[in-house]
Every structure is written in structure tokens, then in C-alpha cells.
Amino acid sequence: MSDPTQKIAVLGAGSWGTALAALVARHGHPTVLWGRDAAMVDAIDRTHENPRYLPGIALPDSLRATTDLQQTIAGASWILVVVPSHAFTETIKLLAPLRPAGAGIAWATKGFEPGSGRFLHEVARDILGPSVPLAVVTGPSFAKEVTLGLPTAITVHGDDAAFAQVVADAMHGPTFRAYTGDDMVGAELGGAMKNVLAVATGVADGMQLGLNARAGLITRGLNEMLRLAAVIGARPETLMGLAGLGDLVLTCTGDLSRNRRLGLALGRGQSLSDAIREIGQVVESVQTADEVMRQAEQHGIELPISNAVRAVLHGEITPEAGLKELLARERKPEYPQTLFT
């Protein structure tokens, strides 16, 4: 059961950071939300609304917001990082010297470290040292629906079972189910790859290729997740659960997904720059596609859908050419016999 006396610090005042801060605040936890944009943070603190990312949705009166990182973290029982993947390393470095003794670090960031392609738990462990409890929060969850109190299920995977349970308990409530696990590699892989695959289904829908094409891309996309999972030490059941299949289905079919919307725009003939400008928020797939293919090349495996997305995002091929290449590939058994062994 969650301890309501725990102070929780949430770093990142975008849509997902705000939604999770509001969630734990509603469950009775003293919660402070940190952001860099002074005007937006002030609006959250005074009016209890995030006018940029969650307009018109009331946030708990008890939720505080500030641009002062030290004030946010001071006295926190644990810290939740919810920033884009390109800001993750910097944020962990900023919080490291301010972290109260014993406070674990969780994050709801999805993606890899840009440039290195490292998993985020590897980045956090290198910066924070061997003794700090770590956990990743992931699964099929749109910020708007969580903030509105609509039913949601996520999972918390950590290298410290007790800390993962603390995080899950703080989030779990009448309309929000939080499960736990210990496969951080699988949990982070699913959360990253689904963004790339959502672009593929968005492109197909933008080109009006039909529901059969969408279902085929989702299923073969899951195959690519499992193929990469098998060579990097992730467990297949993690990818068949909320962290993989669940998040994949949501992101590939729900128009609240920024990555799906990017694909829709590209499939309708829009340029990448125009599509990103229209979305107006960070679209993780643009960076993540490169890192997914870096992992694939390191391990000598083929990920044709992910590679096609990467090529389209770099302007190397058109969506039409990418589709033609995928349809022309040599047929193989649906699943290699070794995939689940």
C-alpha cells in the first residue's frame, strides 16, 4: 500500500510529466513538478492547469510547480524523471548531487541515449552509481486520458523489487493499474521501438492503405521487437505485455500519438519539417529510429520495417518506395524456430 507521507518530485512539465504528477498528487502524495518554462510552470502552480499541453483539464490543487530544481528535490522520497530522451542524461546529471540519501530514481522517458544508443538505465546507473534504486515506468498510456481519469494499465520495471513496488503503489488507484517487473531492458526496448513502428502504421494510414495493412505492420513490428529482444537479453514475455504489445497497439492506432501523427502527415505527402512543426512537441521516433538500427547492425539482425522508417525520416526514400521495398522482400517463415528459445 502506498505511503501518503512520501514526497514525490517529478522532473518535466510536459504532458506526460504533468499527467503523472497529477496522478500521484490525487493519491495524496505531496508532489512538486519541475519545469524550465517559467510562464508555464507559473500557470500550473497558480491556475492548476497546463495550458500548453493539457488545456482545459483541472489539475489537483495540492500539486505544486516550480523552476527551482533544488526546491523540487529537497526531501523527496523518490524522483520521477519525465523528459525527452535527448534531455535525459543532462537531467540525471543535474539531479545527482541534489538527490536525498536513499531516494530512488524512476523515469517515464522512452527512447535511447542519442548518439551512443545506450539504454537509459545504463546511463542512469553510470551517473548515479551502483547503489541507487532505479525503475522505468512504461506501457500504453496517453497523458490526456490519464489526467481525465480514464482506465489505464502500465508497468514498472526495476532492478530493485521493493523500489519498483513503491513506485507502482504510488500510481495505482481506482482507474490506474500499475504492475511490476524486473526486465528493464525489455521494458525500455518496447517503449522505444513502438515509437518507430507507430510512424510506419501512420504512414500506411496516411496513404489510405487500409486496415489489413495496419494490422500487418503492427504484427510484423512486434516480430521486430521480439527479434531484437532475443539478442540483447530482454525477455519475450515483457514484449508480449504492456511494455511491448500494449504500448505498440496504442501508439500505432491512437491519434493522440505524436509518432503516429507524424506518420500520417508523411503518408499524406507533408514534409518532415512541416509535420514536426505542426505537431509542436518532441517526436521521439526521429532520433530513436537511428538508435534502433544501430542496435540491429551491432547484432547483425534485419529489422525491415524499422529500417524503412529510418530511411523515410532521413529523406533517403519516399513512403511509396519504402512500401514497395517491404512488399518485394523475400518470404520467410513467420517466426524463426530459435526466437523463443
Curated annotation (Swiss-Prot):
GO terms for biological process: carbohydrate metabolic process; glycerol-3-phosphate biosynthetic process; glycerol-3-phosphate catabolic process; glycerol-3-phosphate metabolic process; glycerophospholipid biosynthetic process. Keywords: Cytoplasm, Lipid biosynthesis, Lipid metabolism, NAD, NADP, Nucleotide-binding, Oxidoreductase, Phospholipid biosynthesis, Phospholipid metabolism. InterPro entries: 6-PGluconate_DH-like_C_sf, 6PGD_dom2, G3P_DH_NAD-dep, G3P_DH_NAD-dep_C, G3P_DH_NAD-dep_N, NAD(P)-bd_dom_sf. Sn-glycerol 3-phosphate binds at K110, G139, S141, K194, D247, S257, R258, N259. One of its GO terms (cellular component) is cytosol. The keyword Transit peptide does not apply. GO terms for molecular function: glycerol-3-phosphate dehydrogenase [NAD(P)+] activity; NAD binding. Its EC number is 1.1.1.94. The active site is at K194. It is found in: Cytoplasm. SUPFAM superfamilies: 6-phosphogluconate dehydrogenase C-terminal domain-like (SSF48179), NAD(P)-binding Rossmann-fold domains (SSF51735). Pathway: Membrane lipid metabolism; glycerophospholipid metabolism. It is an enzyme of class 1 (oxidoreductase). NADPH binds at S15, W16, R36, K110, A143, R258, V282, E284. It catalyses: sn-glycerol 3-phosphate + NAD(+) = dihydroxyacetone phosphate + NADH + H(+); sn-glycerol 3-phosphate + NADP(+) = dihydroxyacetone phosphate + NADPH + H(+). Catalyzes the reduction of the glycolytic intermediate dihydroxyacetone phosphate (DHAP) to sn-glycerol 3-phosphate (G3P), the key precursor for phospholipid synthesis. NCBIfam families: PRK00094.1-2, PRK00094.1-4. Belongs to the NAD-dependent glycerol-3-phosphate dehydrogenase family. This is Glycerol-3-phosphate dehydrogenase [NAD(P)+]. It comes from Xanthomonas campestris pv. campestris (strain ATCC 33913 / DSM 3586 / NCPPB 528 / LMG 568 / P 25). The lineage of its organism: Bacteria, Pseudomonadati, Pseudomonadota, Gammaproteobacteria, Lysobacterales. The gene is gpsA.
